[in-house]
Structures are given as structure tokens and as C-alpha cells.
From Swiss-Prot:
InterPro entries hit by this protein: Formyl_transferase-like_C_sf, MPG, MPG_sf
One example GO MF annotation: alkylbase DNA N-glycosylase activity
Protein name: Putative 3-methyladenine DNA glycosylase
SUPFAM superfamilies (UniProt xref): FMT C-terminal domain-like
Assigned protein family: Belongs to the DNA glycosylase MPG family.
Statement: the UniProt record of this protein carries the keyword Translocase: no
Disulfide bonds: none
Phylogenetic placement of the source organism: Bacteria, Pseudomonadati, Pseudomonadota, Gammaproteobacteria, Pseudomonadales
Superkingdom classification of source: Bacteria
Keywords of this entry: DNA damage, DNA repair, Hydrolase
CDD domains per UniProt: AAG
Gene Ontology BP term (one): base-excision repair
């Protein structure tokens, strides 16, 4: 049985949580299989800034954002499911932006094959592993995570958990979040990417034309 992170792990500042989640593995049990993906990209959100759902105010749909750290907040984005975890402070949370399939003794090649069946490409063909979880809705589809089943719930160590498998990134890239409309605090550098997996995330912050110090920063572990 995988070892779940305790709820208090999530009860910390959203940016710290976003950084500390990089390298952790999400596991979701479907049937007899533990589907798994290593987190490689996260975004932090605060109630006090305009890019967050919580800034629009409390509703029953958004209640998970206002609960203690470690509650699951899911919503639909562009027709797909998205996964967030509440952080310390009402309305603060971390969006799991992308991940990379993870295989080990608990989550084997059969689990990976099931993830590929869950998330074929537009033509129905099998996606290569490196593209399987390269976006917030792709991740949820591959792992079989659905809004009606998990929104506003706690983790269930028997079915859904986040595990520390000792794979902390050597360097972290800090940059701006994706998809934030103009005038909604789009300038805030609240997106964090495992530098070793940058080419597999939603949008590579190291792509041509991006300038260090202007468009992104490197954070060494311990900073």
C-alpha cells in the first residue's frame, strides 16, 4: 500500500506547497490498478489576487477552496476535469498543471497501459507516455479523476493519495501562470516547473524567445 502524505502537508502557503508538490506522485486506484503520475508543473492561487476562482467569492461549488489545506477542489476547464488542492488560508490553492507517468512496483506497466487507454489522442491512437499527462485535463483523464467523484473531498488512502517517493527536483523554474486573462494579475510568477521535465509540461518555459530574469527564474533547492 502506498504511503499517503498527511493532510497537514498541504496546510502551508500556496507557493510553498506548489514547489513542494513537484516530484510527488499522485496515485489513483482504479479496479486493481494504482494509476500514477509524478507532478512536474503546478500553479499557486490566492484569494486576494484576481487570477483565482476564490477571488470571485464563496459559492457551494468553490467551498473546497475555503476549507483546510488538503481538500480536493475539482472543476471543468475547456470541457475536461482539473485537479487542485486547498492550501493554508481560505481561498488559497494549488492547481496540478501537468505530470509525467510514473511506474514502479506499485504502479506497473499495466497501470500505464490503462492510463493510455483512458486518454487516447484525438484520432483514438495511443498517446506516448511523455504527452499523456501534459496538461491539467489530460492528467485527470489519464488518471481517471472526475469532478463529481472527488470535488470537495479529502484524500482517501485506499483510493486517491499523494506520495513522497524521494524524487525532489534539482532545480525549479518559476514563471507566470497560463491562461490568466489580461488585468487578472497575469504578471504574477506563481507557476512552478520541475526543470528536468520542462519540455514535457503544458508549455515549456525554456522555449525559444524566453529570457531568464524576465520571463522566468531558476530556483535551486533550498531557495
Amino acid at each position: 500500500m502506498p504511503a499517503a502524505l498527511p493532510d497537514h502537508f498541504f496546510h502551508r502557503d500556496a507557493q510553498l506547497l506548489a514547489r513542494d508538490l513537484l516530484g510527488k506522485v499522485i496515485r489513483h486506484k482504479v479496479g486493481e490498478l494504482w494509476l500514477a503520475a509524478r507532478i512536474i508543473e503546478t500553479e499557486a492561487y490566492y484569494c486576494a489576487e484576481k487570477g483565482s476562482h476564490a477571488s470571485l467569492g464563496y459559492t457551494e461549488k468553490r467551498k473546497a477552496l475555503f476549507l483546510d489545506g488538503g481538500h480536493i477542489y475539482m472543476y471543468y476547464a475547456r470541457g475536461g476535469d482539473s485537479l487542485n488542492f486547498s492550501a493554508e488560508g481560505p481561498g488559497n490553492a494549488v492547481l496540478i498543471k501537468s505530470a509525467f507517468p510514473w511506474t514502479d512496483a506499485t504502479s506497473d506497466e499495466n497501470a500505464l497501459a490503462q492510463m493510455q487507454l483512458n486518454n487516447p489522442d484525438a484520432s483514438g491512437a495511443i498517446r506516448p507516455p511523455q504527452r499523456l499527462c501534459a496538461g491539467q485535463t489530460l492528467l485527470c483523464k489519464a488518471l481517471g479523476l472526475k469532478v463529481p467523484e472527488w470535488d470537495a473531498r479529502r484524500f482517501d488512502p485506499q483510493r486517491l493519495l499523494v506520495e513522497d517517493i524521494g524524487q525532489a527536483p534539482e532545480r525549479i523554474i518559476q514563471t507566470t501562470r497560463l491562461g490568466i486573462p489580461a488585468g487578472r494579475d497575469e504578471h504574477l510568477m506563481y507557476r512552478f516547473v520541475d526543470a528536468g521535465y520542462a519540455r514535457f509540461c503544458t508549455r515549456n518555459p525554456l522555449r525559444r524567445g524566453q529570457v531568464e530574469g524576465r520571463d522566468y527564474l531558476f530556483l535551486d533547492q533550498g531557495n
